[in-house]
Amino acid sequence: MHKDWPAMADELNVAIKEVRLGTPDVMKAFSAMAQAATKGGALDAKTKELIAIAIAVAIRCDGCVAFHAKAAVKLGATRDEVMEAMGMALYMGAGPSLMYAAQAVEAFDQFAAMQPGA
């Protein structure tokens, strides 16, 4: 099964905009939480995105996979780092996570191929 992860992220951005317009206070709070959770601290932002993509696999959230694969690429994650994160997701989620791990790697590869010089 092949999915177009960049297109999925773009389509979800349109849908999320509608939610943002309909629930501005909730979405402001969600954005503030996202900023607080992803900023560097004891763990850097890239490590946090690797954790996020592993969690996205474990909870089987396609949109989450798309957004966190894109963010991981932007933060300089390597394919090897994503693979190690997928190993942890598999360990924590067993068989169903294997299906999402394959999709998360596919999403990462698609976003990485879009980078200049790829």
What is each stretch, according to the model?
Residues 1-47, 99-118:
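Acidic, glycine/proline-rich low-complexity segments that act as flexible tails and inter-domain linkers
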Residues 83-109:
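C-terminal structural segments of small proteins and small subunits
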